[in-house]
């Protein structure tokens, strides 16, 4: 986990990691997740994932199915 926060958001498009962000608040991270889907969801091959870095558990992904 980074000092920036426990909740890690990633955007992968066409198999390349494009963006990362970390937040201490799950509520804030989920808001960012929704914003990223709206802003970047139309990129070819986009996959957005929110992970709890403390447990290693993916909390949500977009799109829902790979």
Which residues fall in each region the model found?
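A short, charged, amphipathic alpha-helix used as a generic interaction element across diverse proteins
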Residues: 23-45
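Short aromatic-glycine-(Arg/Gly/Cys) micro-motifs in beta-strand/loop hairpins
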Residues: 1-19
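Short linear sequence motifs
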Residues: 1, 16, 26-29, 33, ...
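A generic structural signal for ordered secondary structure
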Residues: 4-8, 33, 48-50
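Short, mixed-charge low-complexity intrinsically disordered segments
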Residues: 38-66
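Surface-exposed loop/edge segments in extracytoplasmic proteins
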Residues: 15-21, 56-61
């Amino acid at each position: 986990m980074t000092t920036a926060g426990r909740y890690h958001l990633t955007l992968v498009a066409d198999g390349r990691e494009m963006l990362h962000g970390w937040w201490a608040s799950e509520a804030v991270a989920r808001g960012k997740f929704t914003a990223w889907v709206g802003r970047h969801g139309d990129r070819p091959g986009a996959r957005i994932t929110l992970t709890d870095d403390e447990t290693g558990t993916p909390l949500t992904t977009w799109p829902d199915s790979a």
